[in-house]
Amino acid sequence: MQNLALISLFSPFVAFLFASCFALSEKKQFVGIICSLLVALSAFCSLYLLFCNEAFNVSLFEWFAGVNFGFDIDAISLTMMSVVGIVATCVHFYSIFYMAHDEGFNKFFAYLGLFVFSMLFLVMSDNFLGLFVGWEGVGLCSWLLIGFWYKNDTYSFAANEAFIMNRIADLGMLLGIFWLYLQAGTLKYDEVFSMAQSLDHNALILIATCLFIGAMGKSAQFPFHTWLADAMAGPTPVSALIHAATMVTAGVYLVIRASTLYDLVPEVSYIIALLGAFVAIFAASMALVVRDLKRIIAYSTLSQLGYMFVAAGLGAYGIALFHLATHAFFKSLLFLGAGNVMHAMNDKLDIKKMGGLFKPLKITAILMCIGSLALAGIYPFAGFFSKDLILGYSFISFHHGIFLVLLIAAFLTAFYSFRLLMLVFFTPARHDEHPHEASKIALLAMSPLMVLAIIAGFFEHSFFEYLSTKLVFIDAQNQIVMICASVAAILGAILAIFAYKNSWFKESIEENKIHKLLSNDYFIPQFYHQFIVSKYESLCAILKHCDLYIFDRIVEKIALYSQNISQKMIMPNSLNLMLRFLVAAFVILLILVWMV
């Protein structure tokens, strides 16, 4: 079993090393195939361990006092490993098609392999320090992949934005880990959680808050949310991987993994739930008006992450993990479908300039319809089951304000999901392109995700039974909630269909103040640029001038003065002085030797 766990972890790393050998060579398709097979091997091992349902620890060596280099294989880590493995395998095979004509083909697969390895390292680690190493690894890889086409300044800026914003949040997480080590004397999960109740409550509040700040950055929660939509600059398979299985799900995983700590600080947990509810409706509102195909799906990710944090914040950690898993399947399906549309439309992303794509892209349209139905939470698709449980638990736990916000967000989710479908596939064509369906390998790569987007929800009971060894089972099913959620989703879908079929919204709506507010992301990016980025740039300019005209000149003056002194000392008439210095130095050296 331990060998299988290590194979699962290191297979993507081997893929990274293999592809790196060809990184500077011309495109070789076998590189993509071998890397994809290695990641598939990792997924197979993870799934085998999942079905065996055997928890164990792999301890390799001690880093330093209180921290071992090891991995915990339990229900939580195996669930994450399996989700990461399945999605990563599909994305790898899909990338063979998507990146076929890119000169960086080999390098792309190297980065993908390292990305998957870092995420697996994160979820398998048995201590907070190992988690942080994987955490920084996915941050680095996201920077490499978002800025993969770095010659484009916009893409490069988006990569830097994601990297810097995550580094700011990671500082909070690092402080939390340091404080936890000072309080507990260890960072190993089992040891920390066993002594958690004996730790000072105020210290726990500080630790939990700092850890969540890190989670906010990685999972793009407000106010660290702006990087997520801009990260769409990267290749579409990267978007699928970041939004479905790696990177953004790491923050949710951290809160679930540290559930023992968060149970002891309900005040922090409740703030997490409130923030999640706010982000759910905040992101959904922006997705209503966005014209960029990938950004719509990105905002839907942000909204669904809000749902997950609501569940985790209210203590329903198993439900949060269930929604994380189901969301991974239909979200990656949607992103890969968007990749097919982009490929057919010569990389155009404006959905207002699409339409009429159902006939030429029939299979892609069906796949994206399935993904959208799951995202909207319509029965019997996967999203219905997991989202319904989050709504149900917020209702039965008497957090009716949060429930109402999530219900409105569910309505908005259905609306923007079907708005996307209508404008892309089912309204008259508004373009001059000659679109064609994606290759068979791309469609085959999407097939497992399609199946899971349909059936994953039906494994609800077996999923929670499997998790019962690590997380408390909560029965959150409620008939009233189920009816309300279904009605909200169906109404949202029907309204979008009729609105865009009958052209209810004219172009003049874009002049509306509310529309401008939403389409400009509530002007938050502009606020950041004007009051933070521009001020930082001004400070940098001042420091640059100080460096050039003050510090550099001081150094030059010191160097010139030293040069003049040295020249005087080596003049022939200074030989007597030099001999005196030599004798004095020799005497001092003898005294030091004698003292020793």
Curated annotation (Swiss-Prot):
GO CC aspect terms: plasma membrane
BP GO annotations: ATP synthesis coupled electron transport; electron transport coupled proton transport
Pfam families named in the record: Proton_antipo_M (PF00361), Proton_antipo_N (PF00662)
EC number(s) from the headed UniProt entry: 7.1.1.-
Keyword terms of this UniProt record: Cell membrane, Membrane, NAD, Quinone, Translocase, Transmembrane, Transmembrane helix
Family matches, as InterPro entries: NADHpl_OxRdtase_5_subgr, ND/Mrp_TM, NU5C-like, Proton_antipo_N
Coiled coil: none
GO molecular function terms listed in the Swiss-Prot or TrEMBL record: NADH dehydrogenase (ubiquinone) activity; quinone binding
UniProt xrefs under PANTHER family: NADH-UBIQUINONE OXIDOREDUCTASE CHAIN 5 (PTHR42829:SF2)
Job description of the protein: NDH-1 shuttles electrons from NADH, via FMN and iron-sulfur (Fe-S) centers, to quinones in the respiratory chain. The immediate electron acceptor for the enzyme in this species is believed to be menaquinone. Couples the redox reaction to proton translocation (for every two electrons transferred, four hydrogen ions are translocated across the cytoplasmic membrane), and thus conserves the redox energy in a proton gradient.
Protein name per UniProt: NADH-quinone oxidoreductase subunit L
Gene this chain is encoded by: nuoL
